[in-house]
């Protein structure tokens, strides 16, 4: 099946400009330092803000088969788990984090 490369690039640019870049800018705007660099992270609440921001972004993507859950343990930073039903055999695990470290 041949793809129209110009249309694919156009769609990619639209998604980047319309969804990814604004969301990334909003994410970067939240300080959300790692607990190692912000001992009062629970009181500051920025890690919770980032989790909520990311959950809203995930909700807006409309990805079929996607589910997520936020796990909290007292005294530990929250964990966001995202699952997407696959279309083939096997599993993939991707790890990332939403906190930041100062430069």
Q: Where does each model-flagged region fall?
A:
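Acidic/His- and Gly-rich active-site-bordering loop/insert found
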Residues: 2-103
């Amino acid at each position: 099946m041949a793809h129209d490369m110009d249309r694919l690039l156009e769609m990619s640019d639209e998604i980047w400009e319309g969804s990814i870049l604004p969301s990334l800018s909003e994410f970067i705007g939240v300080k959300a330092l790692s607990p190692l660099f912000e001992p009062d992270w629970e009181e500051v609440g920025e890690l919770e803000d980032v989790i909520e921001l990311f959950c809203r972004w995930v909700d807006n993507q409309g990805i079929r088969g996607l589910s997520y859950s936020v796990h909290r343990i007292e005294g530990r930073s929250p964990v966001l788990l995202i699952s997407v039903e696959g279309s083939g055999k096997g599993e993939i695990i991707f790890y990332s984090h939403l906190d930041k470290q100062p430069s």
